[in-house]
Amino acid sequence: MKKYMVVENYKEGCFEEIYERYNVKGRMFPIGLHFLNSWVNKDKNICFQLMESNDPDLFSEWFERWKDLVDFELYPID
């Protein structure tokens, strides 16, 4: 499977709401998108997630579910 680094830039004032949703609904990944690890910097409102998938189009589906709270950047890892 191909690995990807996802950079989540939390929208201003949304940190608490993001984690409230996460605690209720989980990460809301589509089937086929796999979480490996994550690192959060609360002071900078940013999260880095190491992920893998055989279908990069699944990221768009996942991003759509969080777009009201998070802006995403996606980087394939070679």
Model-predicted regions and their roles:
Residues 1-46, 54-58, 78:
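Short S/T/G/P-rich N-terminal loop/turn motif that feeds into the first structured element of a domain
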Residues 26-27, 66-73:
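A common structural junction motif
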Residues 62-64:
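Short, exposed beta-strand-loop hairpins at the edges of beta-sheets
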